């Protein structure tokens, strides 16, 4: 009896050790990626760019966090203590674009998600690996769904409050206010402060309309990252679907997809984008993302097609076919997960490329007219001859593109089995 108990205890201990030592494919790739310090720290640089994009209103906005207005100052209904910054984040008088509303929402939802993630990660040791992975997947899906619903409700609600000039009110000595670090909005126009040199008030000076350049570059981070990510997501989705169909089914499906790819690559991509842009009278950020997404999928499609052609001849796929699994299950459970590694690397480089395309369109005056794009600031610098208006957005574009390319190179090497150390 004692021997049976010892054997059972040994079996449980061996199983626990095996589960603790087990490394998934993602763990292997992550450990390998960490061996490339330049790419690893560049990834954190990209994360910081995203954090800066989210926290832009915390750093620069012409609305105070806190305001205490005494009786007799301003409108009668303004007397008392106010926290206008929190409502201004979703006020369409201050933020017209849905892009800004989305990033402003992340100021509140990201910390909540981070806390939940830490609690979930802390419970990892108490759960079986399969249960932890299931719980993590559900958390990501429910979090994305919840944030999408909240954003849709807020955006469609069209929330507006009566406009209040908080900068003018704060000039009264009896009014107590606490503003962000910079009291400017990227839309503020001050014709009395046109083309000012950098100083303690305007860190990078002002442009032709008196708008603070540093604030516009700060909010321009949102545009660049969003256009890069969303445009790449669009053309990656198209490329994966078409490339997967062509590679798996072959025959006439492959022929049709390849002919479509050949037609698309006959046209220079940038000129094709310019042509499509010409059909839009008043382009928005979403139009630019859609145009880039609809024209950049050919490379992904060819890459996925090649991966599917290689993988469908592998033994594990042939075994799945022999077992009678449905084609949908074979494609989505066995082939596609193994084909997405090179796609991820290509998408990382694609984000940098999309940012450059957007900056080029804005530089040529073909981007959104009201958006604080880095390309627009470059145009102002070219027309006015001010060095800071050229160097500041140029450096921002350079740093962002370099960081993304370094991350892509590290991911490419980490996914290559021949380079594993």
Regions found by a protein language model. Give the residues of each.
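Gly/Trp-centered helix-boundary motif
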Residues: 1-236, 240, 354, 370, ...
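Alpha-helical transmembrane segments of integral membrane proteins
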Residues: 130, 151, 206-421
């Amino acid at each position: 009896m004692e021997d049976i108990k010892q054997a059972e205890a040994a079996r449980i201990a061996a199983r626990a050790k095996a589960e603790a030592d087990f490394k998934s494919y993602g763990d292997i790739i992550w450990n390998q990626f960490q061996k490339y310090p330049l790419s690893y720290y560049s990834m954190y640089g990209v994360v910081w760019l995203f954090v800066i994009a989210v926290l832009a209103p915390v750093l620069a906005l012409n609305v105070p966090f806190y305001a205490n207005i005494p009786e007799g100052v301003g409108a009668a209904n303004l007397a008392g203590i106010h926290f206008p910054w929190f409502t201004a984040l979703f006020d369409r008088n201050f933020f017209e674009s849905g892009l800004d509303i989305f990033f402003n929402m992340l100021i509140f939802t990201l910390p909540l998600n981070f806390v939940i993630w830490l609690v979930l990660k802390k419970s990892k040791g108490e759960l079986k690996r399969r249960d932890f992975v299931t719980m993590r997947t559900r958390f990501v899906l429910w979090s994305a769904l919840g944030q999408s619903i909240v954003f849709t409700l807020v955006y469609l609600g069209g929330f507006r409050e009566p406009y209040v000039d908080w900068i003018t009110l704060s000039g009264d000595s009896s009014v107590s206010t606490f503003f962000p670090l910079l009291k400017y909005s990227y839309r503020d126009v001050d014709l009395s402060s046109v083309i000012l040199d950098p100083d303690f008030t305007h860190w990078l000076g002002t442009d032709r309309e008196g708008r603070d350049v540093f604030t516009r570059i700060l909010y321009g981070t949102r545009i660049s990252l969003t256009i890069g990510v969303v445009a790449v997501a669009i053309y990656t989705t198209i490329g994966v679907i078409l490339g997967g169909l062509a590679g798996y089914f072959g025959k006439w499906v492959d022929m049709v997809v390849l002919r479509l790819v050949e037609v698309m690559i006959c046209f220079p991509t940038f000129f094709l984008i310019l042509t499509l842009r010409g059909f839009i009278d008043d382009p928005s950020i979403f139009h630019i993302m859609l145009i880039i997404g609809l024209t950049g999928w050919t490379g992904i499609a060819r890459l996925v097609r090649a991966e599917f052609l290689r993988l469908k001849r592998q033994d594990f796929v042939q075994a799945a076919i022999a077992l009678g699994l449905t084609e949908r299950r074979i494609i989505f459970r066995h082939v596609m997960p193994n084909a997405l590694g090179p796609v991820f690397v290509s998408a990382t480089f694609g984000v940098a490329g999309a940012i450059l395309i957007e900056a080029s369109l804005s530089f040529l005056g073909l981007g959104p007219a009201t958006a604080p794009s880095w390309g627009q600031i470059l145009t102002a610098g070219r027309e006015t001859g001010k060095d800071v208006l050229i160097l500041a957005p140029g450096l921002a574009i350079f740093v962002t593109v370099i960081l993304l390319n370094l991350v892509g190179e590290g991911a490419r090497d980490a996914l290559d089995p021949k380079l594993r150390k």
